[in-house]
Each structure stands twice: as structure tokens, then as C-alpha cells.
Amino acid sequence: QNDYKLEVLEILKTQDKKNSFKNIRQLLADSKVSDFSDLFRLLFDTVDDWGAGHIAECILILSKYQQSDAVVVDKEINIMAMFVEIIGSIK
């Protein structure tokens, strides 16, 4: 399960806006993850690598979606909404 997180980081760092969204969505669907707490932490720890120039905004996005993660029914929808905002911010 850790592999999918590293792939997400690689996608954020290297792919364009359209491909990033499509590939992250597919990756999360394929990995069948239901708990994204480790992903939130990894994204925070590595924000300097993938969010250069937008670090403060990315941290605020992570915080907002981590908070809502605790109360939403479908966590995959919540995490993809987060990636829509992140990708829109950094690409």
C-alpha cells in the first residue's frame, strides 16, 4: 500500500494537469485504499518537493481535506476533491 503513495508523489512532481488528475484517480481506485491518513502525512512531509512556489496554499488545502476526511462517507471522493485543488494550485 505504500507504493501507491510514492506513485502519487511522482505523478504530482512530473505530470501535467490533465494526466495528473486522471492517473491519480485511477491509482487510488486500483489501490482500494480506505484510510488516507498516511497519504496526508506523506504529502505534508514532502510538500517542498511537489508544491514548490505554492507551499503555504498546499498546506492549507491538506489541512482542509484532512479535517473533512473524518466526517465524509466516501473518503475517495474527498481525497480526489483535494487533488483537484492541489493540481489546480501547482500546475
Where in this protein do the model-derived segments appear?
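AAA+ P-loop NTPase domains with strong preference for DNA replication initiators
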Residues: 1-91
